[in-house]
Amino acid sequence: LKRTYQALSSLIEETKMEIIHLDSIATSLDIATSESDLSQIKEELMEYGYIKKHYDRRKGQKAQSKSKPFHYVTEDGYDIYVGKNNFQNDELTFKFATGNDWWFHAKKMAGSHVVVKSKDGELPDHIFEIAGQLAAYYSKGRTAPKVEIDYIQKKQVKKPAGAKPGFVVYYTNYSLMA
């Protein structure tokens, strides 16, 4: 009975992580704007075994172009980037953003990673508001009147070993309502 309990506890935890991952994919589908966005989502679904891989017999065909994160430039010149799917979120957070850039995400729900390129480590208050609004809009809570947004400098955001795309951990964060 004890071993059964341990095995079931482990399976329940794995299933919870799968649900979180699939929830983030569903949110990515909600905000996809192009065929290349959908292709990246399909690629992730195939990579993790949710759908079967279909091999293209037509050789020598051009690879589909990768979709890119949304890019916004504020009136005062701050660059804000928004990942549209889990692969983009990983790339944006761990390959593109630098340590002093600011990272935003909807608290405890699936959504896009939002990165504000920092000019000197600090941002004006209105940039925090804009980035928070983008993180709220590109999240599962996009239709809610208010969404709690966590934000922190990118150097405080970590990816656990073996974690699925888009999954991160962070601790000493700030929060705002957007």
Segments predicted by a language model, with ranges:
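Conserved NTP-handling cores and scaffolds of large molecular machines
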Residues: 5, 26, 30, 135, ...
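Flexible, glycine/charged-enriched surface loops at secondary-structure junctions
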Residues: 11-16, 145-149
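Coiled-coil termination/hinge junctions
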Residues: 13-79
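Duplex nucleic acid-engaging cores and interfaces of nucleic-acid transaction enzymes
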Residues: 51-178
